[in-house]
Amino acid sequence: GRGVPVSRLLTTSVPHVHALGDCAEVDGQWLPYVMPLMQQTRALAATLAGKPTPVAYPVMPVVVKTPAWPTVVCPPPADAAGQWEVTSSDDALEARFVSASSAEQAGALLGFVLQGKAVSQRQAWVAQVSA
């Protein structure tokens, strides 16, 4: 692992000790970004206030802000079965990771990469992953 192993309640193996942010690995996922930290903070605040609240993440693409070649990455789940389908042109790249698993609807969008002019489609792709 890359962080302190914690449950969805952000509890460690030591009673009354919690971890969040860059140092926490929630159910095997290490997410050193601002949006996961915000979700973790809300969940932990509720838990510490007496209402046990597991952290739940929305679809959270990572935006790499480079003027020459902007990039948005929404990685598929680590254990997802599927394949990448890539299309590109001189000014854009679209890569989609689609499900091949019978447990999920075959062909469902599980992750993506958008680059160049394709980054303008981020919200539409996030909605497809959320569906």
Please describe what each predicted stretch is:
Residues 1-43:
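FAD-site-proximal beta/loop scaffold in flavoenzymes
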Residues 3, 21, 41, 50, ...:
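Glycine-centered flexibility sites
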